[in-house]
Amino acid sequence: MDEFXXNSNKNRXWQQFFXYPLFFREDLXAIXHDHHLDRFGSSEPKEIXVXNFXSFLTVKRSIRRICKQNKSISLFGNSDSNKLIEYNKNFSFKSMLEGFTIVLEVSIAMRSKHFIKGMDGWNSLRSIHCIFPFMEDKLPHSNYISDIRVPYSIHPEILVRIFRRWIRDVPSLHLLRSILHEWKNSFSRENLEKVLITQRENTRFSLFLWNSYVYECESFLIPLIKRFFNSQSLLYGSFPDRTHFEKKIKDIVIFPLHKISTKKIWLLKDSFIHYVRYGERSLIALKGTHLQVKKCRYHLFHFWQYFFHLWFQPYRICSLELSKTSFSFLGFFIHVKMRPLVVRAKMLDDLFITDLITNELNPIAPIRSILFSLAKEKFCDISGWPISKLSWTSLSDDDIXDRFDRIWINLFHYYSGSINQDGLYHIKYILLLSCAKTLACKHKSTIRVVREQLGSELFTKSFSKEREFISSSFSKTRSQRERIWNSEISQRNPLXXLWQKMENKQIEN
C-alpha cells in the first residue's frame, strides 16, 4: 500500500511538470469550446471545426507526431482568399488559445501549493481599496517612493523561457512557441513584428501571460531588493547609545566634530522597504538615504535589461521625496503631510507640554480631471456647466435616472476616502442638473416643468444611496478625521482610468 502511494505521488509530480496529457482531456476541450462560443454569442458550431486548420484534434495529432519525431508538421494552414475559411481559421485559433490557457491554468493549480491554501482569503483581497489602508500605515514612515510602470512589451521567446521553468515537456513548449508567434503576427500591421504586447487585448490568454510575467518579475525582484536593504542596514548598524558613540568620535583627532554629520547616521538607521502593485503600476516605499534610492533605481534598470533582455525606459521609474512632492496612483493624488500634535505629560507634580510632528497620508480626488472627463463624455462643457445628454433621450425616464444615479454612486464610493469631499458634491450637482436637462430635452420642456411633474422623486429617489452608505459606515462616536474606504470596489473608476491614461501620455512625452 505504501509503495502504491509512493508511485501515485510520483505520477502526480510527473503530471505537474508535463502539461501535454491535459490536452487529451475531452472535458477541458469542451469547456474551452463552450466558453469561446459564449463569448461570441454563437449557438451553431457546425461551421466552426475545420479539419485543415487549428483545432483540438489538430493539437492532439501534432503532439503525437512530435513524439514520433516527424518534422513535417503544420499547426496553422496557409491563408485562403475565402472569407469563411479565414473566419473559421481565426475562430479555431482563438478557440485553441482558450483551451491552451485552461490547460496552463490547470497545470499551475496542480503544481502550486499556495494556490489551494490562498483560496479562502481570496475574497477579502479583491478590493483595490485594501491598498490605501496599507499605504496609510506604511507611507507616513517612509521618506522616498519609487513609482514604477512595469514594461508590458516583451519578446515571445522570453515568455517561453519563463514557462520553461515549470513546463518540462518539449511538445507543450513547441506548441506555446507556435501560438505566441502566430499571435504576434496578428499585430504585424502595426509594426510589432518583434514584440508581443501582453496587455494588447482583454482576453484570457493575454491576462494569463501578463500575470505570469508579473509573477516572474516579482518573484525575483522583491527578494533582491529586500536583500539589498537588509545588507545596507546590517552594514551601518544601529546606534542605540548615541551619547557614548559621539564621545568616541570626540577622542579621534583626525575627524573634527564639526565635520561629522550625525543626521546622516540617523537616516542610515533601520532602513526598510514596502512594495505594492495594481495592474502595471508599482510603488516601492523606502526609508533611507538618497544614495540608497539611486542604487535601487540602478538595480531595477539592470534587472529588466539583463534578466528579460529588454530596454527599460528611464521615464518608467520616478523617484520622489514624499515630504516635498505628491504623486498620482489609482486615480488619486497622494500627498504625505506633516501634522503637529500637542501632548501633555504629567509626572508627579510637574506638567510637561511637548509638540510632536506626525506624518499623515492625504488622498485627494482630482476634481478638475473628473470635470474634464465629464466634459469629454458630454455631461457638461469645458467650464463645468451641465448640459443634456442627448444620446440618452431615447431611453425611459427611469433608465435615465438610474444611469446618472449609478455614475454618481460609483464616483462617491470610489472617492469615499478622499479628504476633499466638497468637490465631490460639486460633481453631484453637475450630474443632477445634467439629468434634469436630459429629461427636459426628452419631453421638450424646461427644468422647472420636469421638477413640477416629477416632484421630489428627482431629488430623493435618485442620488440618495450615499446617505445609506454614510449612515452605515459612520456613527456618532467615530472620529471625523477617520476615513472610510469602500471594500466592494474591485476595479478602478472609468473616469479615473481615463485620467490616468492622460497622465501616462504626458509622462511619456
Swiss-Prot record:
Transmembrane segments: none
Protein's GO biological process: mRNA processing; RNA splicing; tRNA processing
InterPro entries, sorted: Domain_X, Maturase_MatK, Maturase_MatK_N
GO CC term, one of those recorded: chloroplast
Assigned keywords, A-Z: Chloroplast, mRNA processing, Plastid, RNA-binding, tRNA processing
GO molecular function, one term: RNA binding
Subcellular location: Plastid, Chloroplast
Top-rank taxon, per record: Eukaryota
Family statement drawn from the similarity comment of this UniProt entry: Belongs to the intron maturase 2 family. MatK subfamily.
Alphabetized HAMAP family for the sequence: MatK
Role of this protein: Usually encoded in the trnK tRNA gene intron. Probably assists in splicing its own and other chloroplast group II introns.
Protein name: Maturase K
Species of origin: Thujopsis dolabrata (Hiba arborvitae)
